[in-house]
Amino acid sequence: MTRFQFHRIAAAVCLSSVLLAASVQAADPIRIGVPVGLSGANSVVAPSVVQSAQLAVEEINAAGGILGRKVELEVADDGSGAVGAQKAFDSLIFQKKVNVLISMETSAARNAGLPILARGKVPYIYTSFYEGRSCSPWMYVNAWVPEQQVPPIVDHFMKDKAAKTFFLVGSDYAFGRGMLEFTKKYAEGKGAKVVGEEYLPMDGSDWTAVISKIRAAKPDALITSTAGGAPNVTLTKQLRAAGINIPYGNLAVDEGTAKAMGADAQGIYISASYVTGIDSPKNRQFLAAMGKKFGADLKTPNDLSVPQYEAVYAYKAAVEKAGSTDAAKVVSALSTVSVEGPRGTIAMSKERHAPLTMYLGQVQADGGVKVISSFKDVDPGAQCPNLK
């Protein structure tokens, strides 16, 4: 063999190795991590969140994936709390090697996971409504904050129900206290008076003492902010059993949870960025696809599961704009992309948060939500001014 032939063969072998490596890399799936409360306070709503993510991934793969790569879901139960979230984040980021985290979680779970997120340097799209002002260079939020959700309920109670006094009830953690802190400030700024404010632990289920205080205070209206679906169920059931029938706004009930609550949920006022009754081609298409995929096992799409569906598409758009799954490039691209989803056009363009159309509604006997009024493109306000 001549030296020339040797070099040609060596070059061919090297080229083949490079092409093979590139082919293998291109075939590697993109992994989306979903840490979510399949147990604990969020167990009522978490299955609907997983279903929405499953549909989005199925649709994307059927259309060719992302940059030609198949997408896979990795779901981890965070137990709806801090300890479980630390385990779930660590497992997904460092063992499963996910490219992104996309999920709805309690604020306790989110806050516990953020330091692990920073260490792993993985993009995170948080899809749960929350108390606001949680900021990380790696996190975006496509759900509502108090500035978007609270005013429609308080304004309606004061204007249409002549409410002058409010009683506030929440779970004793970041979401419960953060939401009601904003509610109190907003209501008092409008001239109302808060005559009581009570909290139970996240896993609290006996509201007897709180209900006694509500009776004694005789408020014109009640607003609650509890942790996930389970506390909503117990609190509302006990309120109804006690005969508390004043105007009742719940800052943590979604349409899916309302259906699970049965007759007890009837009459509750909610403020949400999604209701199944949104009359748009995208929403009708989404609901039809969910029904076709899950049939009798379908969990009612809601204000926690629909942002999950849209977030998967937002990640797809960011990766395609960045031209790769490189974490820093994707994080940079996320603020510049928008998606057309069941809620309309969603862009996380305002300090890592999204302007949203909000719907004030009241739960009906069948668990559905009757829309009273809507508010287009409500600004999230100043959430993370140091992050653009």
Regions found by a protein language model. Give the residues of each.
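Extracytosolic ligand-binding ectodomains
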Residues: T2-Q5, I9-S16, A26-K388
